[in-house]
Amino acid sequence: VLISYLLCFFIALLLHELGHLVAARLCYVPAPEFGLGWGRKLFGFHLGGVEYKFHALPIGAYVRLDIAELQRRSLSRQVLILLAGIIVNVVAAALTAGTPFGMMNLLLAATNILPLYQQDGWKCGMVMLRALLRRKSAVVEWTFTIAGSCVSLALIVFQAIRHL
């Protein structure tokens, strides 16, 4: 049972990152690297201008975007690329509702939308803040980061207490 849940999570994670990759390519933002796992690289290959890497620890995944090119895109395209993984997970969860795979997709979408540092929700919030302010502001960005972490923690604690 544990193996099947881990497999569901891994596939949901793969779909999430593929969402970012496909959205970036559709918006002409280079994504030179797609990685599964962390730690030492076990193997990899190049395909279509992307280096696909597989690492020793099968925890997490990432798509490395060309940030300079991403920032040259419109606000709506930046937000689309940053939220594409979450959108894919929500669609997959809806299509497979009531299954472990649906649950893993929903869990992945819910945790990624939180404004926690380096999560998709945080990155999207930063893009929108910078567009709203028309500049970078360290004070505002740190305030958003700290407040986002506090709100996320409060939501998690509230949910945990609610389910006791």
Which residues does each PLM region occupy?
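Hydrophobic transmembrane alpha-helices and their immediate loop junctions
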Residues: 1-164
